[in-house]
Amino acid sequence: PPPRSRVLSDDEQRRLLKALDAEPDWIVAAVVRLALATGCRVGEALGARWADIDLEGLSWRLPSPKAGNVQFIALTPAVAKLLEGLPRFDDCPWLFPGPDQKKHRASIRAGWERLADAAQLDGVIVHDLRRTAGLALVRAAGLHVASKALRHSDARVTARVYAPLQLGDIREAMVKAEKSRVLRFRKKGAA
């Protein structure tokens, strides 16, 4: 089957951000914001340790990544500011601690369902945040950079998922190009 292609529209993203402002669980709100901003997997966010976050160097080290080698997630100044604002707990290595602070929070499922309902996000699953961030990266910097940022093992994975999502962008560019050609053709034909 083709890969899931659901991404949040601009309007859905606005509704989600508004719902996040009212979210009572700070961990749910921060994890969702982090996933939407960086394209990280929710499990990566939940398992993040303070020792792996470099706020000055704007990077997040993933010590036991999916691909088997050390990987990094680039942080923007806005994401660093989000992380700086998180509470820290004595002797707790986790950004998002569980109730006893000995382990990280295991899930945000209930919180995500609450947020999706509040933002009226029909059919949206939490992994769609990663795809939404990925599409924004593709649009801003191309498939190659998005592939690296999302830490896909092969650029073909990125192309398979995001190329179909770019059809609207491609169509828009083709219409612009077509209009310029039509105008050029008309000028030549009118002479």
Regions found by a protein language model. Give the residues of each.
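Short, contiguous acidic/charged loop-to-helix segments that flank catalytic cores in large enzymes
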Residues: 5, 21-22, 63-70, 97-103, ...
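C-terminal catalytic core of tyrosine-transesterase DNA break-rejoin enzymes
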Residues: 30-33, 37-44, 111-114, 130-153, ...
